[in-house]
Amino acid sequence: MNEEQRLGRNGNTDAVSTKEAGSATKDYSKYFDFSNAKVVSEEDGKKVIKIAGREISIFDQPDYKQGKRRGKEEVKVLRPDDLIPEDMKTIGAGKKFLVRTYGCQMNIHDSENMAGMLKEMGFEATDETTDADVILINTCAIRENAENKVFGEIGNLKQLKREKPELVIGVCGCMSQEEGVVNRIMQKHQHIDMIFGTHNIHRLPHLLRNALFGKEMIIEVWSKEGDIVENMPRAREGKTQAWVNIMYGCDKFCTYCIVPYTRGKERSRRPEDIIQEVRDLARQGYKEITLLGQNVNAYGKDLADLDYGLGDLMDEIRKIDIPRVRFTTSHPRDFDDHLIEVLAKGGNLVEHIHLPVQHGNSEILKLMARKYTREQYVELAQKIKRAIPNASFTTDLIVGFPNETDEQFEDTLSLVREIEFDSAFTYIYSPREGTPAAKMKDNVPMEVKRERLARLNALVNDISAQKNLEYQDKVVEVLVEGESKKDPNILAGRTRTNRLVNFKGPKSVIGDIVYVKVTEAKTWSLNGEMVEMAEVNG
């Protein structure tokens, strides 16, 4: 999943901290020393240890070696009707919860599931930490900066825990799948009550019960992915846009990426379950869905009984009465001709392709284990543009990969000029503990990396501004998402090509699709005037 979805949909990142962007500065080795821990008991698959006065019940801990293994075990589809134990169905009556989400849309999707379970247990949502009885921090491990923010929040909650000792604080998500992170929390953040990972979200009611009725810190992090759990409660944010997960995990193992370790192997949902979910959302009046996966283009490859891929799925979904359908994130290796053919049919399949390239030099791409060359990417991009000539084409780019030369960086600049991306999300490489790239020696000074990022951003911004000028004085279809973050008197929404549009209009059109005439084209957004409502609102 790309950095655009992880960190927000607008803009690139000019400011990068030295700690975040430099060579690996994190040293978690000290957190692997448990000489000060006392083993209290070991039985029935549970180990209880005591550190600095607090007992910790360990059911499962993260293990990178286990997380990397890709076995041939059958992945079952579970449809439980008893996710919430009987004694937990009213445990939250009169209490409130807060789920803080960092990272990508997949994390937002997971947080919606957790919120759904908490609501079924009687809890009420709140945005205020001081009002919450349960706080869950759903974490992102893709960059060091994201981890630093999480540990900052964990530290800030320590005083609140002192004031409200009955408060339950849980840490979940991708960071929980990292060995060093869990060890650090055990030793340095003992006000945390439970830690669980990405594979056992459905176990939240049981883990919460242990945390509420026991005094120990609860740790249950499955290193190996589990089965696919359907029918999970979900509390979606809003009634306009919805995330629909179509698959889990990633098997690409790019050398810089932690996701295959934290999200497990690729597992596809059954197409009938996905289609039914989309139909339900259409009946509820949703205007846009985004099909989610770490690598959506690999969808269906693990379904042994079906010859069915992403193109087949989208060909069925395009017939459902929902105005807009998006998908993210793609990998160039799996973007096949059938998918291009289906996308070219248009209709509710929007004209926006986000296809992360990461670098413009074939040697660097090989070091990244992307398994394609620059030439192959260009050929694919041109094929897509020929089939969908009005499509917006965006990407992700990394600068400062270990030992990147000036010539190799120039190849990235020339690729941006050749493809003319409508926008790109650009980053200085951030080493991830446990990945092959983190072990590579790097002789590129940080000031050089920063200068390269600035040059790349200047080029991307220039092309983006030119592309946006093409919208000047044109009328575009906009899905109104809400008030502008900068001005509550201005509404904001997106075109089918994913351009941000700001305009004045009545609050009553939030959630609807309207037509807007573009009056000003800026680098990263468009300004306009509302013309009329669109017929697709029904």
Swiss-Prot record:
Residues 469-532 form the TRAM domain. Binds 2 [4Fe-4S] clusters. One cluster is coordinated with 3 cysteines and an exchangeable S-adenosyl-L-methionine. Its cofactor is [4Fe-4S] cluster. Residues 236-466 form the Radical SAM core domain. Catalyzes the methylthiolation of N6-(dimethylallyl)adenosine (i(6)A), leading to the formation of 2-methylthio-N6-(dimethylallyl)adenosine (ms(2)i(6)A) at position 37 in tRNAs that read codons beginning with uridine. It is found in: Cytoplasm. It comes from Halalkalibacterium halodurans (strain ATCC BAA-125 / DSM 18197 / FERM 7344 / JCM 9153 / C-125). [4Fe-4S] cluster 2 binds at residues 250, 254, 257. Residues 95-213 form the MTTase N-terminal domain. Keywords: 4Fe-4S, Cytoplasm, Iron, Iron-sulfur, Metal-binding, S-adenosyl-L-methionine, Transferase, tRNA processing. It catalyses: N(6)-dimethylallyladenosine(37) in tRNA + (sulfur carrier)-SH + AH2 + 2 S-adenosyl-L-methionine = 2-methylsulfanyl-N(6)-dimethylallyladenosine(37) in tRNA + (sulfur carrier)-H + 5'-deoxyadenosine + L-methionine + A + S-adenosyl-L-homocysteine + 2 H(+). Its main location: cytoplasm. CDD domains: Radical_SAM (cd01335). Belongs to the methylthiotransferase family. MiaB subfamily. Monomer. GO terms for molecular function: 4 iron, 4 sulfur cluster binding; metal ion binding; N6-isopentenyladenosine methylthiotransferase activity. This is tRNA-2-methylthio-N(6)-dimethylallyladenosine synthase. HAMAP family: tRNA_metthiotr_MiaB.
